[in-house]
Amino acid sequence: MNNRLQPAPCIELDGAQGEGGGQILRTALTLSMLTGTPFRIERIRAGRSKPGLMRQHLTAVQAAAEVSGATVEGAEAGSQALAFAPGPIHGGDYRFAIGTAGSCTLVLQTVLPALWFADAPSTVAVSGGTHNRAAPPVDFLIRAWQPLLARMGVTQTLALKRHGFYPAGGGEVLATVTPCAGRLGALHLTERGALRELSGQGIVANVRPGVARRELEALAARVPGVVGSVRELSPAEGPGNALVLDAVHEHVTEVFTGFGERGVPAEQVAHGVASAALRYLHSTAAVDEYLADQLVLPMALAGAGCFTAVTASPHLTTNIAVIEKFLPVHITVQAERDASVVRVQVN
């Protein structure tokens, strides 16, 4: 995908722009690898309570550097400035350890799009957190994100080998990727189709199963039609608790997740999941805000496509701004006549 006949000019980024989080860095790493364009970013996560690079961000940088043979400056804990100059993307067998409960999914979402266009198949194992309230859980990637990528021509599988909850981590995810034969196909996702299933799962590891049962009962009371089940993991994978709701529609599956914490009632966890799900179900949008965040980059790589979403989050608009610095695309976000829906178009 990249063109290295002439040295590409370095792109300058402000890590505090827009939403100001780690997504700016991750998107820049992905697109830098894919386009062969070096970048420099200042003020990384400057507005956060702990600014600069944290362990999961460092792991994403190190993973991108290994996949692309990049030259990197500033890859240190707490650093608020980073320079990244990529080389060619190489497929292979990779293993990355975050060392904390930092998100495996965010590291994977940094390097996987590059490996879609590598010179050989790849496997990527990442250890760390798999169920973390600050990032999409692995369930979301497997059941919401991955099927839509497959429709665009991506051949990729994700397997959850071991759960990793905050704060201990210790989880592992394995991804396998076969490079794409050509450019990604455009995805047009403006309707979600008929509702087929509402499936709730209460996951517990070294936590009483009664907690999951209470969560599911409270969820079913708020969201009619939910069919729930309790999943007990090995105590060694805990302590941890997650409540996961899949809204399976004809054209898309959305995944909503809440996480149990010490001192937080099970009913409160269920209330959060139910509120997010009902906002989506009561709209006519094809996707919720978090899936919208994750779709815009592959759509930009395809060069075309559109989807409707519940809202245009600050994450989404900031991501769009970074994408447009690296790729010759124009991405518009417009409110539909239905005030609960926005339309995102890639041209």
Curated annotation (Swiss-Prot):
Keywords for the protein's UniProt record, in alphabetical order: ATP-binding, Cytoplasm, Ligase, Nucleotide-binding
Pfam families named among the record's database cross-references: RTC (PF01137), RTC_insert (PF05189)
Residues annotated to bind ATP: 109, 290-294
Entry keyword Kinase: no
Transmembrane segments: none
GO biological process: RNA processing
EC number: 6.5.1.4
A GO MF term: ATP binding
Main function: Catalyzes the conversion of 3'-phosphate to a 2',3'-cyclic phosphodiester at the end of RNA. The mechanism of action of the enzyme occurs in 3 steps: (A) adenylation of the enzyme by ATP; (B) transfer of adenylate to an RNA-N3'P to produce RNA-N3'PP5'A; (C) and attack of the adjacent 2'-hydroxyl on the 3'-phosphorus in the diester linkage to produce the cyclic end product. The biological role of this enzyme is unknown but it is likely to function in some aspects of cellular RNA processing.
Entry similarity comment: Belongs to the RNA 3'-terminal cyclase family. Type 1 subfamily.
NCBIfam families reported in the protein's UniProt record: PRK04204.1-2, PRK04204.1-3, RNA_3prim_cycl
The protein's name: RNA 3'-terminal phosphate cyclase
